[in-house]
Amino acid sequence: MKRMIALDGAQGEGGGQILRSALSLSMITGQPFTITSIRAGRAKPGLLRQHLTAVKAAAEICRATVEGAELGSQRLVFRLGTVRGGEYRFAIGSAGSCTLVLQTVLPALWFADGPSRVEVSGGTDNPSAPPADFIRRVLEPLLAKIGIHQQTTLLRHGFYPAGGGVVATEVSPVASFNTLQLGERGNIVQMRGEVLLAGVPRHVAEREIATLAGSFSLHEQNIHNLPRDQGPGNTVSLEVESENITERFFVVGEKRVSAEVVAAQLVKEVKRYLASPAVVGEYLADQLVLPMALAGAGEFTVAHPSCHLLTNIAVVERFLPVRFGLIETDGVTRVSIE
């Protein structure tokens, strides 16, 4: 019998990342775990619908036995069975992030007995989670270089607070892992600005695009009007395609915040990324830790290691026989497998 790993949910960023990473790693390694003080660092601690959906999804995919799987629970015990590929559908029942649920269960399906398809309904444009286009256009091309083949499709948008969005991912078992080396970003090839609107006047998007174009030379400017029943909502994105990597940044519009202010927030974030020689942005760095650890090698550079990144590394090192090294040089942090 494999040993039970005990985790403190209050460590590091004190949010849902510890739980999601633990679920992924438990499903992959077969090691059971207990986590206490779940989301202790949040204003509303314990499991929310999004986290509970991730737990139930993980349990269904690997036939696990779970204690504490209920709303508001701050303690969870997870003992898994066998991971099985197949077709799965999960509903969050709120505007909680679809992509964070997918992020939890997809790594286990890289090791399943056959191809799988996972569909999640809930929120798609959430300021606290990567949108589907980030997964599709930024993360998945890098996963393919590592040897992980999955394809994410956004079937319907769902903005906060209504939700109602649908995201699906098809994934195949991994044959072998490759090493990902992201040492240099390379020259910028092109930049693309994009605005999504649902139930919001078009002039809002036009002003947001104008703000982006006032700071960057955009090769593409796209405005997408979504059906009104998918909103109300507004998301502004800017994609930076460089020779060795594509990064994508986004901001979700808010009521009573002007289009110019919303877009200016995005401009500031992109300028901060471009001012640093670091290859990956803060959010992408979080996503690369687990696949890199499974490959057993690799490296990337990031401007500053976020609390999310450090927490993710700490959890990975509890489950896998790997050690990460973080070395700061010339204003960036090099993250690698030691």
Curated annotation (Swiss-Prot):
Residues holding ATP: Q103, Y283, L284, A285, D286, Q287
Pfam families linked: RTC, RTC_insert
Signal peptide: none
GO terms classed as biological process: RNA processing
Key words of the record: ATP-binding, Cytoplasm, Ligase, Nucleotide-binding
One Gene Ontology cellular component: cytoplasm
Annotated GO MF terms: ATP binding; RNA-3'-phosphate cyclase activity
Highest rank taxon of the organism: Bacteria
Cytoplasm among keywords: yes
Cited PROSITE patterns: RTC
Active site: H308 (tele-amp-histidine intermediate)
Cell compartment(s), UniProt: Cytoplasm
EC number(s) stated in the UniProt entry for this protein: 6.5.1.4
Catalytic activity: a 3'-end 3'-phospho-ribonucleotide-RNA + ATP = a 3'-end 2',3'-cyclophospho-ribonucleotide-RNA + AMP + diphosphate
Gene3D superfamilies tied to this protein: RNA 3'-terminal phosphate cyclase domain, RNA 3'-terminal phosphate cyclase, insert domain
Similarity comment: family membership: Belongs to the RNA 3'-terminal cyclase family. Type 1 subfamily.
Protein task: Catalyzes the conversion of 3'-phosphate to a 2',3'-cyclic phosphodiester at the end of RNA. The mechanism of action of the enzyme occurs in 3 steps: (A) adenylation of the enzyme by ATP; (B) transfer of adenylate to an RNA-N3'P to produce RNA-N3'PP5'A; (C) and attack of the adjacent 2'-hydroxyl on the 3'-phosphorus in the diester linkage to produce the cyclic end product. The biological role of this enzyme is unknown but it is likely to function in some aspects of cellular RNA processing.
Name of the protein in its database record: RNA 3'-terminal phosphate cyclase
Phylogenetic classification of the source organism: Bacteria, Pseudomonadati, Pseudomonadota, Gammaproteobacteria, Enterobacterales
Gene symbol of the encoding locus: rtcA
